[in-house]
Structures are given as structure tokens and as C-alpha cells.
Amino acid sequence: MGPGPRCAPGDPGWMLGALALMVAASGRFAFAFNLDTRFLVVKEAVNPGSLFGYSVALHRQTERQQRYLLLAGAPRDLSVADGYTNRTGAVYLCPLTALKDDCERMDISEKSDPDHHIIEDMWLGVTVASQGPAGRVLVCAHRYTQVLWSGMEDQRRMVGKCYVRGNDLQLDPGDDWQTYHNEMCNSNTDYLQTGMCQLGTSGGFTQNTVYFGAPGAYNWKGNSYMIQRKDWDLSEYSYKGSEDQGNLYIGYTVQVGSAVLHPTYITVVAGAPRHQHMGAVFLLSQESGGDLKRKQVLEGTQVGAYFGSAIALADLNNDGWQDLLVGAPYYFERKEEVGGAVYVFMNQAGTSFPDQPSLLLHGPSRSAFGISIASIGDINQDGFQDIAVGAPFEGLGKVYIYHSSSGGLLRQPQQIVHGDKLGLPGLSTFGYSLSGKMDVDDNSYPDLLVGSLSDHIVLLRARPVINILQRTLVARPAVLDPSLCTPTSCVQVELCFAYNQSAGNPSYRRNITLAYTLEADRDRRPPRLRFARSQSAVFHGFLSMPETHCQTLELLLMDNVRDKLRPIVIAMNYSLPLRMPDRLKLGMRSLDAYPVLNQAQALENHTEVHFQKECGPDNKCDSNLQMRAAFVSEQLQPLSRLQYSRDTKKLFLSINVTNTPSRERAGEDAHEALLTLEVPPALLLSSVRPSGTCQANETILCELGNPFKRNQRMELLIAFEVIGVTLHTRDLKAQLQLSTSSHQDNLQPMTLILQVDYTLQASLSLMTHRLQSFFGGTVMGEAGMKTVEDVGSPLKYEFQVSPVGDGLAALGTLVLGLEWPYEVTNGKWLLYPTEIIIHSNESWPCQPPGNLVNPLNLILSDPGDKPHSPQRRRRQLDPGGDQGSPPVTLAAAKKAKSETVLTCASGRARCVWLECPIPDTSNVTNVTVKARVWNSTFIEDYRDFDRVRVDGWATLFLRTSIPTINMENKTTWFSVDIDSELVEELPAEIELWLVLVAVSAGLLLLGLIIILLWKCGFFKRARTRALYEAKRQKAEMKSQPSETERLTDDY
């Protein structure tokens, strides 16, 4: 039967206009199953635009002739020419032929009588239903109108009308079913009663009942009617609900069946798509007195979804109770791109249905998914009822086929029939109406008739379904010893097939050919086996049946197989290749030659081949890999902390791996034993002992053995270059993971954490450790001093700090501290600091806390020497410790007669602590400390000493709150020798004549001495012969000259 009208009662164009706005756009895909789409029976309208296919039904005629017919309603078809009417609608009966235009109009004679009834545009064929094999046919026209006269004024009542015809689609006056008027609505009432009831909007048959929907009754509240016949008795039933509101459309669709709310009694299921604007389904039961009583109402969940516009009953899980499917074609979810829904309510053993659906099926956006629903029988003959759902506005229309199981309806469709892939010109809105549950080609599989709004109907026939039996796959031997392989075979595989038809037809013995594919070691690359015939790991073959057929294949072992623990999986999958026509073929060609494989069966099989291993009788290796690891020094001593400095180059990791038995584990061979190490970027793999064991990529992978045998031990020593440790590095983490293809489930990763102590390397140097200065003159008090020159002679120390390397930033600060001899024990000034300047990229003064530098705020100026008289001069001293030798003074040229030393350690001087932070820079930093000798103190307290030495200390240290960063303090001493001021007398000038006399006397004396030496022969030289003779005589006397003589022999 058809799903009922898709227009609002009383307005034939409302729904058509609304549906015209809906355009489908979906690309869903499902595996094609057993509804054939190549050999079709297609029928087209005689009169285009008649909505031929608006409603459809499959019918089996058994009277007068045996045949199957396709019934199609065309509610907008032209009327039979009578001179009074133009368009009444019609119902067509179509034979199962290859022709598209051989449908005949069903003879329903209704003469036009405008004074009593109006048949113009009565939508004959809005509902078409068949009672089943050898049953009758129901045809309705829900816009059939009665005319009432009140004086000269006529009143029209659109009560609707239904016609029952015999099995041969002819009127039999002797059949009470056909002659009964079926007028359930009273045309003498107005729309508030049943005067506009629109009977026949929906309707159908059971074996002893005919039922109708009348959604326009009672101000379009709606009603459902049922006529039941038992023997010669006839009973009429209608629903008289307590609802007082209109526009519910109860009866828009109606289904009747038993085993719904009672095992044997009938239950009427009526849709009301406008109930509370969200739709509802009423479940009504028979009561005495002809009433239908409401038992349960299932309500929709979304406004405007038209929940209840299509309904179907089917026992989905084979529990003996019919379940309920409800369509809501205008349901939508914008974000999810959903358009249309089908609610599935599972029967609770006849007591009721749950308020919430057990399953909610969705269609794509704007598809009107669920506008038609049909129970189509068991099309694949798996023992469970199947369902078809139309989505006419998805593309050119689609029909979704859902299978069911013991758990109910399956969520995913098993097949989607695409209207645009059928190759039918002019086809659209495919799936607008559906009818099934009848096998029209006698192949034991029910078929499906699909209607549309485009004047086409299409018969989809079910292909036979093949169950593959005895799909065995056996490998011999099951445990492979590679030493027993021959050049032609290592493993032998045997596969066998047999089949039957799912419908259980024993006469179906077609010769079919299965295509199969065998793949050795499917999950591994490269594979470990190959087929001898194909020289690869994949083999394609064919097997012909109907009898059980087997085939045997030989396989060979690949060279250099490493993995001998995991079994070799030999997988098989198979299919049924058929040469289907490339184009559409119309007609009733037998589909027995085009079976399909049962998609519910697994279309693959597999077997395993194990390697012979020393792993006990179960051939299962239970290893017991254990590991100990630690960071060690070059002397292989464990490290608890890494004392890192810039001189640190290497770090070592010691790893010990064993595979020994324990109480819990057998300690059998560990195949493909691997060690994976993940180390931080600061560590770079340098070397491994034993060499060649490990390889470094993103991680370090060490091959321990294949297999790593029982009771085997192994020690690895891995050396890393330390390249990336910074001041921010707190620790070094290494993660070690043992793995094996043998069975061992307790291999947990090990994490080693080595704390890092970062030792900074900085240096402190002093340009001149020991300065020289002086004191003398007169005593001057603090009040009389204006400039630093008034204090005394100047001093300047130049400290140099080398770069640390990595910048400290916020981690800490380098500080130069000075233990400065500030005053003597009696509180008098000693060395007065005037200025501290730091030189790096820029220069700036250092101001230690406590106002210790130039506390008297004396005026700073460059020191200079004052002129002295020609007879007396002060010793010139270098106050800044310039490069080169200090000038020689009288005090420095001779040892001081008396000297004293002032230090803070001895208690003879008091020191203060001066601190200057060193900038965080990579350049060398110079710190200049300027001071003045407090002249007055030395004149008053140390005039009795020729020299006073004052000592102090400078320390470079790190100040940080990070415990892992440290630096060894750098300390140096500085000193100054302060001499008392001395005056040296210059010698008196000598007369010139005395000089001339002295020179002349000297020359005369020299001349006398030369004459005397000449007279004595001092200037005469010896002869050469005498020299040689004497030398030769000497050589003769001493046969072996001494070493000294040898060295001096030529002189």
C-alpha cells in the first residue's frame, strides 16, 4: 500500500509546493546487496503530470489468470472522457513486462453528478492497497465531495470515498466487501463533525478487516475507522477520543495488525503528524460497542518534523511481537547536516512501547528521509524482517534498505539504491512510495516496488543469496622447521569451498565460480613466505562449484628470516565475480544466474604457521628479560649527580640485561630482543660497547639478540657527548624500554634521572697587585678638605673579570667583593675610596651600600704633580699602576730602614666590605677602584717608618638562589707600599780647568805604559811552525785526548 497523501487535507497543492522546495544533497554509500538494479521493470504514466506512482502496491492475481501486477495510483490523472469531468485521478495495473507503457486503467465507474457529488479532482488513487495473495484491492479518493442543498444554496462536504474491488480488479456485485458503501463519515454534518473527514487519506486490508484514515474529521482532529468481518457479522469501529483541539490529523497514516498490544486482538496504529505541532502516534484497541480506545501515545520530539506521517509494523527481532517504525521526514539538525528521521520503537512483549525510541535513524540534509517506510519482508532470507525507507529528495531520490537481527534493526543500511544510478531519463523523487513483502518472480526472495512523483514506478527484484559453507583453509605443517624445507615446498596450503542458497531451495544447483585471494604474512613487510606458483606472497585463483571443491598450493620460505617467533598468517578472502550488464536491461530476466554472497558472512578466513622454537611443548616463548642501568663516570663509578662544567665532555650509561629463569617466569628465549633509549637533546650518542649494537635515529635502538637466549647476559656501555647542558638544565632524563616478540607482559619502561650541578667558570685578575705611593707634608683635617687631592696621593687598582660563558640572566649574579682597608684601629682613615667604575659595553659607577665610597663627597679631579724647586724634587710615583717598570726612587733603590704592615687579618687595620655586581655579558668586564692615601694618618702615626705596607683582598663570587648552580670563589690580594717622603741633595758643580788637567794627565800615563810593554816584546807573535810542532808533540804523548781537549782543540 502507499503511505497516504503528502498534502494537507483540504489543500491538494500545499504539500507538493513544500516538497518542491526540498533538494537533496547526499553522497552516502553502502555496499550493494541483493536488490538488483540492472534488470528492472519500469512503468511510466500514460498522462504526464498525473503523479503516477504517488502510491504503489504489489498484487497477485489468482482469479481468471495467474499473474503478478504492479498497482500505481495517479491521483492527478485525467478522467475517462464523459463530457463532465476533466481530472479525477486513476489507478493503473501494470504487468511484469519489458514495456514501459503497457499499464491499463483500473475500471472504477463513478458517474459525475454535480448536484449530488463531485468527482472532479477527487484524487482517485491517493491510496492503493492489496489484501495479499488471492486478496482484494482497495482504492481511495480522499477528496470525493458530497453536495447538500439548503434551498438554492449548495454545501459541499469533502468526505472522501474508498472502493473495494475483487482479486481480478473487477467489481463483483455478489461480494459484500465490494458492495458495502464504506461511508463512515456523515455528510449531513459540518467540518466540526465528520463533514470534511477526507476518508481514504490512508487505508489498507487485513484478512478480515478494512481500515481507513480520516484526518479531516472533527475540525481536522482526525479519526480512524475500521470495518471488521467475522463470518456473516460486520462491525464498525471508530476512535472517539477526548481531545478537543483540532488540526491533529489523526489517521493521516494508519496500520492495523495483531501481536502489537495483544497476541491475537487487533491494534490500530494511527499517525497524527500535527499533534501539539510535533506529531504523535496513537495506539488504539478494540472495545465493545464499536469504539477504538486509546492505549498509548508516542510523541515526537521536534516541532514541524511531521512525526507520524509514515508508520510501519514489523517483528524486527523475531520475538513474536510487532515493533513500530515512525517517520519524521522534516526532522533536521543543522550542525549535523541531518534531514529526516525514522524512530524505531521495540515492542516490550505486548505491554507497551517505550516512550523513547530504541534507535533513531537519520538521513542527509533536505532529503525527506522517512517520508515513506515499508516492511518489505525477509529479502535476504536470513530469518529476520527487513525495512525500506525512502528519501525522495536526496539527489534524484534514494531508497535505504535496513536488515534486522535478534537485537533489532541494524543501524547501518545494507544497501542504498540510488535513483540517479538507475539510468532512467526523467526519474526524480525516487522512493516517494514503497510496497514490498511479495515475491513476484518466484525465486523465494520478496521484491520491492518503488514509486515517485515523476510519473515512474520501478520494480526492484531480489537476487538469490549464496551462503559459503566449509570455507576451510589448512596449512601443513602447522609448526615449521626451516631445516626440513625442500627446494619446492616448505608449507602446503589446502582450501575447500561449498555453498547453499539462503532461501533453502534444494533445486538451486547453479554452477558458480568463486574468485579467491591468498596472502601469506599479510601483516608483515617483507613477507616470510611466498607461493611457488606466483613467486610472490599473493596468489589469485578461481574455484567452480556446485560440488565441494578443494585446491592445494605450495609455499617457500624467504631468505634471512629474522622473526621466527610470531606466526605466519595466511589470509584468504573470496568474492563472486559476475558479468553484469553495463546498461539497464528492462524485463523479467531470471536472476538465478546472478546470485550474491551473503554479506552477513565473513568473506575471509585465515590460518597460522608457527616456527619451531625452543620454547617448551606449547611452542610459546615466555622470556624473563631484566635490566639494570645507571649513569657512570669514566672510571665506571655510579653517578648520583653530574658536576657539570664547560670542561665536561663525556657521560657514560651502563646497562646490564639478563634473561634468567625465576619463580614466575621460565626465562625462555627472547626473540627480537630490543632496547630502546630516549635521551634528551643535550646527550649525543658517541660510542657503544660492544660496537655495532646500537643505532641512533630519533631514538637509540639496540639489538640485544634474536633470540636473546636463556641464561644469557649482556652489558652495554654507551658513551654520550654532553653538548647541550645549560644553566637551565636541572637534570638529564633517559627512558629505557626493553621489548621482545616473546611473551612477557611485565616489561615496563625504566626512567633514569641524573641531577645536574652546573659549575660556572670565571676568572679574576689584577693588572698590578702591588702599588707604590708616599706620604709627607703637613697634616690637614677633614674640615679643610675640598677635593680628593687634599686627601693624599692617588691609588688605582684595575680588576679584570673574564666571561662566564652562558648568560646567567635571572638565575644569579656575579659579584666582585673587596675587603678594603678602610681605617686604622684608632678610627683614623687609612685608604680613602673615591670612585669605583665598571667598564663593559658601557661604563657606569658602582655604589656599594652604606655610602662607603667617597663618604665625604669630596670633589673628584685628575691627580697631577706640583712643580718643585730645582734643588729638591718629590719622587715621581705612578699612582695608577701603569704598565712598565715602576720608577726607581731613592726609597726603592735601597732597603728601607724600618717597615710595618697593616692588614685586617692582623687586627692592625679595619676593613669594610664593598660589593659591585658584574654585568651579565659575554665580554670581559674591567672594574677600576680609585682611592687616596690618607696623608694625615701616616704623618701622625707612621712618621717613624720609612715604609708602610697596606694589604687587602678581592673576591669574585656567585650569588644565586638556584642550588644546582655554583662557582668556586676567585680571590686575589692587592697591596700598596707607602713610603715616607725623602729629599736627595744634588752634588756641587766642578771647575772646567780641573777637568782638562785630569784628562791630560790620564793620556800621558797611558802613553808611558804602552812604550814599556813594547820594549819587553809584548807585541811580538810566535811562528806557525813552532805552533804545529808543539801540537804534534802533544798528540804523540797522549794517545787518547780527554773530552775537554777535544772540545777546545781548535782554539
Curated annotation (Swiss-Prot):
It comes from Cricetulus griseus. Residues 1-32 form the signal peptide. The chain crosses the membrane at residues 992-1019. Residues 33-991 are extracellular. Ca(2+) 1 binds at residues 315, 317, 319, 323. Heterodimer of an alpha and a beta subunit. The alpha subunit is composed of a heavy and a light chain linked by a disulfide bond. Alpha-3 associates with beta-1. Interacts with HPS5. Interacts with FAP (seprase); the interaction occurs at the cell surface of invadopodia membrane in a collagen-dependent manner. This is Integrin alpha-3. It is a single-pass type I membrane protein; Lipid-anchor. Residues 1020-1051 are cytoplasmic. Ca(2+) 3 binds at residues 439, 441, 443, 445, 447. FG-GAP repeats lie at residues 38-103, 110-171, 185-235, 236-292, 293-354, 356-411, 415-477. The keyword Amino-acid biosynthesis does not apply. It is found in: Cell membrane; Cell projection, Invadopodium membrane; Cell projection, Filopodium membrane. Its main location: membrane. Keywords: Calcium, Cell adhesion, Cell junction, Cell membrane, Cell projection, Cleavage on pair of basic residues, Disulfide bond, Glycoprotein, Integrin, Lipoprotein, Membrane, Metal-binding, Phosphoprotein, Receptor, Repeat, Signal, Transmembrane, Transmembrane helix.
